[in-house]
Amino acid sequence: MGIAFFAGGCFWGIEAGFQKVPGVINTKVGYMGGHTIEPTYQEVCSDTTGHAETIALEYDDTAITYRKLLEIFFSLHNPTEVNRQGPDVGSQYRSVIFYTSPEQKEEAEMFIAEMNQSGRYHAAIATEVVPAETFWPAEEYHQSYFLKIGQRYGRSLF
C-alpha cells in the first residue's frame, strides 16, 4: 500500500482523473503546503494560507507504480505553469509533488529531469518537489465532486 500527494490546479479535476485508474484504491481532496491549521476552502482561495489544492491517493503498489502515478499526474495538468492552471490563478493552484519518502523524492526528481529533456513541453517544468506535510481534508462537498455532478446529470464527466 502506498500514498501519494499531488497538487496541480483545481483538485476536482485531478481527483476525477485518478478515480478510475486501476490500482488507485481511494482519493481525497484537501490542502497541503501552507501555514494555516485546518484551512477552509474560502481561506485557501484568499491566497493567504500558503496551501495548495491537493489530492491524497491511496494506491496498491503491487498494481501500479509511483512512476505511473507521476505520468498520469503530468497528463492531467500543465506542469509548466506557475501558480495557475488555465483560468484558475493563485498559489493554491501551483503544481506540487509532495513526497512521503526519499524514494518518492528521487523518482519525482528523475521524472521531472526526463520530462525537461524530452522536449515534450514548451517551457521548463515548474512543479515543486517538497516533503509532505499535514494533509487537511477539504469540505465534504468537494470530495468526489465530478462524480457527484455527473450522477446528478445522469452521466459521468470522466
From Swiss-Prot:
<comment type="function">
    <text>Has an important function as a repair enzyme for proteins that have been inactivated by oxidation. Catalyzes the reversible oxidation-reduction of methionine sulfoxide in proteins to methionine.</text>
</comment>
<dbReference type="Pfam" id="PF01625">
    <property type="entry name" value="PMSR"/>
</dbReference>
<dbReference type="GO" id="GO:0033744">
    <property type="term" value="F:L-methionine:thioredoxin-disulfide S-oxidoreductase activity"/>
</dbReference>
<feature type="active site">
    <location>
        <position position="10"/>
    </location>
</feature>
<comment type="similarity">
    <text>Belongs to the MsrA Met sulfoxide reductase family.</text>
</comment>
<dbReference type="InterPro" id="IPR002569">
    <property type="entry name" value="Met_Sox_Rdtase_MsrA_dom"/>
</dbReference>
<dbReference type="InterPro" id="IPR036509">
    <property type="entry name" value="Met_Sox_Rdtase_MsrA_sf"/>
</dbReference>
<dbReference type="GO" id="GO:0008113">
    <property type="term" value="F:peptide-methionine (S)-S-oxide reductase activity"/>
</dbReference>
<keyword id="KW-0560">Oxidoreductase</keyword>
<protein>
    <recommendedName>
        <fullName>Peptide methionine sulfoxide reductase MsrA</fullName>
        <ecNumber>1.8.4.11</ecNumber>
    </recommendedName>
</protein>
<dbReference type="GO" id="GO:0036211">
    <property type="term" value="P:protein modification process"/>
</dbReference>
